[in-house]
Amino acid sequence: FCLSRGLGDVYKRQTNPEAKIAYNPSGSGAGVQTFLTGATAWAGSDKALADDEVEQSKSVCTEGTAFDVPVYISPIAVVFNLKGVSDAGKHINMDAATIAKIFDGKITKWNDPAIADQNKDLKLPDTAITVVHRSDKSGTTQNFVSYFKDVTPDNWTYDLSENWPNEVGQGAKGTSGVISTVKQADGTIGYADFSQVGDLGTVAVKVGDKYNEISAEAGSKVIADSKQDDTVKGDNRIVIKINHATEAEGSYPIVLVSYDIVCPAYKDTKQAEFAKAWLTYVTSDEGQKAAQDAAGTAPLPSSLKSEITKSIEAIKTK
């Protein structure tokens, strides 16, 4: 994901000019699996580690098990390309049930009454809806469908997974693949990290009795209304249980928390020193500001700072 590459450049300029950072934006699923083989010092993921992945990390961490530290918050945009709407800079209003039905192939036309009734001011065409989803294992996918599971479970009965669960629409690899595919054809709809949306149209999502447009600020309001998940296994972990059903004013409920995943101890002391210095930087006020400037992310809640510092301090450098 380009945010880590961009932050890496800032980190080198401002903190450690001699650091050599090689970043492969392969997606959360591939990144975690590469980390669990011991091929990388750390991984970035848009979902927390599963319990079996924590257990598996014993084979790559010199001591203990890997842990996840929140590094940024980003809303997930429901993006679309619809002639006369997205190219006119207009949003389309939708509630959770409508979005879920579209991605489950139950709503197939843009002028379906379920959409039209929520958009009285728009003249929606009789254009077929083409769903675009991730073809690869993806934390963004899991966060996206978690919203359906929490808010409109009757309309989304699939098991929660990083893999897209149905045969509706067409798959595209990575965030860039989804964005590129949506841009190529009229009538398309997909989902992607807000930082990558560009000039595509976005859905304003219903929260309570209002439709809220996507923004970093709106996404951060959901996390402020969420709690830590105290059921996860492993030490030093900070995992947010996102409250997708929030009715906080001005909030945008489809959001992800991105984590950096590290070991508490490494065979190579230099790797440990880098992991500790990197996490210290990206979770600092300076690092959070750099992320916000680079990709429009929302800063982490101040309430997490002391726990994040404690987790980072658990990395042994001697």
State what each model feature region is:
Residues G8, G27-G31, S74, D95-T98, ...:
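Stable alpha-helical elements in mature extracytoplasmic
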